[in-house]
Amino acid sequence: ITTTLMGEVLKQAGHNVEYVQADYIAQFAGLETGDLHVAMELWETTAREAMDASFATGNVVSMGETGMMAIEEWWYPAYMADRCPGLPNWEALKDCPEAFATPETAPLGRYLGGPVTWGGFDDERVEALELDFEVVHAGTDAALFAELEAAYQRQDPIILWVYSPHWAPAKFEGSFVEFPPYSAECYNDPSVGINPDAAYDCGKPTGPIWKAAWSGLSEKWPDAAKVIENFKISNADAAGMVAEVDLNGKSIEDTVAAWMETNKGCLLYTSDAAD
């Protein structure tokens, strides 16, 4: 959605745009060779290492933040707050794991993590923070949020991995758990953090969602580069568009067009040159 929105803004500024699908990490190789020109949604939480490696080649440059902030963390519906007093402070989970238990995990609480391929170190986090929870991984992104939807409708116990921007925190009332703040040292040095004997005794990293481009972009299309650098969108606006597509069945193109019509005054671009 962010890519389409950026593309449509560029079109309004008089530029020709071609959309190319690329693997999340493999796209950096395309940017380095100049086969791809812009990547619009690089999460600090998952792409930092790949970004740094590409920037080091000199062939890829940062185009700044998108305005969105990446959040990936344990999340619980608002109705669970009464069942586990003290939330969103993580220490409340030490006192009420049974509030999140299921017949399969009792007496342990059940935490629904993302697919194993997402990483996230939730098993390590549970052990390091001495939480009486069992980590269960959803098979897919769709399965993760389908389970949330079903639990929310029945007011069933659930705590799970949610990320933002996404439609889930826009649709469902709830909160992210507040763990001890993330630091690289917390992940790498057991002596750092509240548990001196274990790493991962803190929350997941958060940070900006970035734009990146082939280093030759600003010379070949200077006006387009300015448009891309100026582009900003909020988590709320992005999540709203994701909800329109995923929940209401609208096409990405129609959703982007509607947002642009409503937010004409927010679009920053110049049109003194076109490609």
Describe the role of every protein-language-model region.
Residues 1-16, 126:
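Short, polar/charged alpha-helical segment
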Residues 3, 20-58, 147-149, 167-172:
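Pocket-flanking alpha-helical
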Residues 36-40, 110-188:
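Ligand-binding pocket segment of bilobal, Venus flytrap-like solute-binding proteins
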Residues 58-111:
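A conserved helix-loop-strand patch within extracytoplasmic ligand-binding domains
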Residues 72-83, 207-220, 241-244:
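A bilobed periplasmic-binding-protein/Venus flytrap-type ligand-binding module shared by bacterial periplasmic
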Residues 168-227, 231:
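C-terminal lobe and pocket-closing loops
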Residues 225, 229-259:
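C-terminal capping/gating helix-and-loop segments adjacent to ligand/active sites or protein-protein/ligand interfaces
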Residues 269-275:
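Conserved small/polar residues in nucleotide/adenosyl-binding loops
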